[in-house]
């Protein structure tokens, strides 16, 4: 009995010691500590010479906000594959492979939405309608329903706005693609890059209901609408079934400073300071070395993480990843 108590005491002491350790976000010490834990992922440097205020602003999702109506369950009788990647399932939909950059703005809530909406429009049209839905239009014109623009927002509000007001097209910064391309430039949060430095500053651009010069059709005629928007229960199989049937979804989770250093593998929180809530696009799932994961697209450019993507533990609502899933069905004709 005393041996069992001694073992339990040691485990408690080890856990307490680990939790009491503090590493500066983005530090070598944090990277080294993570990689010594023999966990399911590898850490490295993704951010160089950036203000911590910038990194915190990237996490611009207000968790636990307004809820959309929950979609009726339909996964019970479905037989789902052990792994699934929307990029491979719908190869004629190029937006699924795309990674965007939110720049110095807490607009992840808008990016997660417009990325998944773009994917779903293409999927529903069987590849006949390929459009980059405008993050700029969502960010600047949604208003109070979505939150506070570059200072943070609600994914549920974004999907509701799409069904009520519609969204125009718009590509990446300086792409001149679509009606309203993104106006906030990418910034250099990596090493030896050519982009301007990242800061925590940045106001929300103004809502402009005019397409950029030379683009047709008009702003009003360029709108793409959702016919429904909804939440999905915190159920692993229901989320998988939704992605399998209709395409990528938007999710949100709690970010700690160790996540900033993700390079490869299946992320599980190890240690680090709370950074905030972050919205992303979930596009598949799988199992890596026995660990189930969600396949996720981020909005921090392609030189973050695994070419802009990451994997996170699946099935345990890790960091709340399964608690705030939202999606919707486009009004795009179904072919």
Swiss-Prot record:
GO BP terms, alphabetized: proteolysis involved in protein catabolic process
Positions of disulphide bridges: 93-122, 105-150, 141-207, 142-146, 179-211, 187-198, 227-331
Membrane topology annotation: Peripheral membrane protein
Keyword Protease attached: yes
Modified residues (N6-acetyllysine): 220
Statement: the UniProt record of this protein carries the keyword Nucleus: no
CDD domains, per the entry: Peptidase_C1A_CathepsinB
Subcellular locations according to the entry: Lysosome; Melanosome; Secreted, Extracellular space; Apical cell membrane
Record Pfam families: Peptidase_C1, Propeptide_C1
Residues the record marks as active site: 108, 278, 298
Reaction(s) catalysed (UniProt annotation): Hydrolysis of proteins with broad specificity for peptide bonds. Preferentially cleaves -Arg-Arg-|-Xaa bonds in small molecule substrates (thus differing from cathepsin L). In addition to being an endopeptidase, shows peptidyl-dipeptidase activity, liberating C-terminal dipeptides
Gene3D superfamilies: Cysteine proteinases
Tissues expressed in: Expressed in heart (at protein level).
GO molecular function, one term: endopeptidase activity
Glycan-modified residues: 192
The protein's Enzyme Commission number: 3.4.22.1
Keywords, comma-separated and alphabetical: Acetylation, Cell membrane, Disulfide bond, Glycoprotein, Hydrolase, Lysosome, Membrane, Protease, Secreted, Signal, Thiol protease, Zymogen
Propeptide: 18-79, 333-335
InterPro entries the UniProt entry points to: Papain-like_cys_pep_sf (IPR038765), Pept_asp_AS (IPR025661), Pept_cys_AS (IPR000169), Pept_his_AS (IPR025660), Peptidase_C1A (IPR013128), Peptidase_C1A_C (IPR000668), Propeptide_C1A (IPR012599)
Signal peptide bounds: 1-17
GO cellular component: apical plasma membrane; extracellular space; lysosome; melanosome
Oligomer status and interactors: Dimer of a heavy chain and a light chain cross-linked by a disulfide bond. Interacts with SRPX2. Directly interacts with SHKBP1.
Function, as annotated: Thiol protease which is believed to participate in intracellular degradation and turnover of proteins. Cleaves matrix extracellular phosphoglycoprotein MEPE. Involved in the solubilization of cross-linked TG/thyroglobulin in the thyroid follicle lumen. Has also been implicated in tumor invasion and metastasis.
Family: Belongs to the peptidase C1 family.
UniProt protein name: Cathepsin B
Gene responsible for this protein: CTSB
């Amino acid at each position: 009995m005393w041996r069992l108590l001694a073992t339990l005491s040691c485990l408690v002491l080890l856990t307490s010691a680990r939790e009491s350790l503090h590493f500066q976000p983005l530090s070598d010490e944090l990277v080294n500590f993570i990689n010594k834990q023999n966990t399911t992922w590898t850490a490295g440097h993704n951010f160089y010479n950036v203000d911590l205020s910038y990194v915190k602003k990237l996490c611009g999702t207000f968790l636990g906000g307004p809820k959309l109506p929950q979609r009726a369950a339909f996964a019970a009788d479905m037989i789902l594959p052990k792994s699934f990647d929307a990029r491979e399932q719908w190869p004629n939909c190029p937006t699924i492979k795309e990674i965007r950059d939110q720049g110095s703005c807490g607009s992840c809530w808008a990016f997660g939405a417009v990325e998944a909406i773009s994917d779903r429009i293409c999927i529903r049209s069987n590849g006949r309608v390929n459009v980059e839905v405008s993050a700029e239009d969502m960010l600047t014109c949604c208003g109070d329903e979505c939150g506070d623009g570059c200072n943070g927002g609600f994914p549920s509000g974004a999907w509701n706005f799409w069904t009520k007001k519609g969204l125009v097209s718009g590509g990446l910064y300086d792409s001149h693609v679509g009606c309203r391309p993104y106006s906030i430039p990418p910034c250099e949060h990596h090493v030896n890059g050519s982009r301007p430095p990242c800061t925590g500053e940045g106001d929300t651009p103004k809502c402009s209901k005019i397409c950029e010069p030379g683009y047709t059709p008009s702003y009003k005629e360029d709108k793409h609408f959702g016919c429904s928007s909804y939440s999905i229960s915190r159920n692993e199989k229901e989320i998988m079934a939704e992605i399998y049937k209709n395409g990528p979804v938007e999710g949100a989770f709690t970010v700690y400073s160790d996540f900033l250093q993700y390079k490869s593998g299946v992320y599980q929180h190890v240690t680090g300071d709370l950074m905030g809530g972050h919205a992303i696009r979930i596009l598949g799932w799988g199992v890596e070395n026995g660990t189930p994961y969600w396949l996720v697209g981020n909005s921090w450019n392609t030189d973050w993480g695994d070419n802009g993507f990451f994997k996170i533990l699946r099935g345990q609502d890790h960091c709340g990843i399964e608690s705030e899933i939202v999606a919707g069905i486009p009004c795009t004709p179904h072919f």
